[in-house]
């Protein structure tokens, strides 16, 4: 059964008015909120009532969702176009039950690889790993892009209060040399360890940055042997790693059943462990595992990722929402939106179903946002008075790591005020009367009132964490991961491939050849616009 069928459109005819719904039901918050350990999920400010929620849940029950959940956790190859299992959950699974993929118990492999990463981290942190000149490592530079960068960078920043080593961790991703130079300007070649994170060891941006970092190192040492002391790799291409000069003992695994955007739980999370220590990294995994169990074992009506996905899919199918705002009210989560943009949009930005047929309904949306209260002085105007339908997720942390309680109270007050303003708004009469009370005459009040009306009745969800710890952050990330999965099932699309990014890579290589040789076939096959752009660049 398709989730986006005509029946969903009729639900809109319920004409939900949030103010009225709250006025007539003093148990609305109790009914439309859930709790998982230290995470409180309030979805009462959404455009639903008992009937709508019941209808959405019935659709989920009639779908293949239950079977798909079992298939994913059991290692079925649900990534059908690449014939791969989807098992990032296995990386944080604390059980000992065997899980066989292609004839191998991957639990044993995962345990072995975790131990290798732990030993490396402890060796570097303790000072037993030394640079080529014998000095202790002080800086880690992670070179990767996409999932090899966004997830670890987000977590390292979010958990800054938990940094417990003397290591400074830097991230390099963009092929623009400025990205690399920002890191190289603040590190010492004698005390820096580079992590090259690339499954194929051929990702253009990562490889180019790695080669330049290697040249920088050798400009200092003038000895190829130094590479082994200052580089480790996370890759499945051992021959390329060895050719680069990295000791294969320090090449860490990436499995085909872990997608890049879900890989921070794997060896890709090494940079996280260097910052917060391996014990805290394990707590991050444990938090995610707690949500995995919640997702697997909880009935849909009390299942947070399922409710998240049902609401988002409902708005997409029924209200034609093309955008989702994500507003974390905590500066530590400043990279959370960037991280989820990739996780969500690369997963569900599809236009054909599992069978390869073009779908006639909307799937993925544009996920965007920023940290509060910055957004209030930037784009919240559009949320409150624009005429685009944009559901909002607020993320708030009840307690902070610092002692500036007045700052924390102001931050939370602003967060809750924004969700309340989206819900209630302010009517023309309210504004008009306030303007009269402020001293304006009737003519002036009438002229200004229409400009100050805020329609309200705009849906939002608030996710409140007790604290932002490794455990709770792991849980938060897993909630969104499973939401993405559920939406893919409801829309009957493959959330785990990303063929849309391949064409640009291919054309980029062709254009690079064309830029270097205007007699090449690649140049001759260019369109006039691209040829003219190249000419403009060459003329400078």
Swiss-Prot record:
Keyword Isomerase: yes
Single Gene Ontology BP annotation: glycolytic process
Top-level taxon in the UniProt lineage: Bacteria
SS bonds (residue pairs): none
EC number(s) reported in the record: 5.3.1.9
Coiled coil: none
Keyword Isomerase: yes
Active site (record annotation): 346, 377, 505
Pathway annotation from the record: Carbohydrate biosynthesis; gluconeogenesis; Carbohydrate degradation; glycolysis; D-glyceraldehyde 3-phosphate and glycerone phosphate from D-glucose: step 2/4
InterPro entries: G6P_Isomerase, G6P_Isomerase_C, Phosphoglucose_isomerase_CS, SIS_dom_sf, SIS_PGI_1, SIS_PGI_2
PROSITE patterns in UniProt: P_GLUCOSE_ISOMERASE_1 (PS00765), P_GLUCOSE_ISOMERASE_2 (PS00174), P_GLUCOSE_ISOMERASE_3 (PS51463)
Subcellular location: Cytoplasm
CDD domains in the cross-refs: SIS_PGI_1 (cd05015), SIS_PGI_2 (cd05016)
Gene Ontology CC: cytosol
MF annotations from Gene Ontology: carbohydrate derivative binding; glucose-6-phosphate isomerase activity; monosaccharide binding
Chief location bin: cytoplasm
Keyword tags: Cytoplasm, Gluconeogenesis, Glycolysis, Isomerase
Catalytic function, reaction form: alpha-D-glucose 6-phosphate = beta-D-fructose 6-phosphate
Enzyme class, broadest EC rank: isomerase
Function in brief: Catalyzes the reversible isomerization of glucose-6-phosphate to fructose-6-phosphate.
Family (UniProt): Belongs to the GPI family.
Full protein name: Glucose-6-phosphate isomerase
Organism field: Francisella tularensis subsp. novicida (strain U112)
Recorded name of the encoding gene: pgi
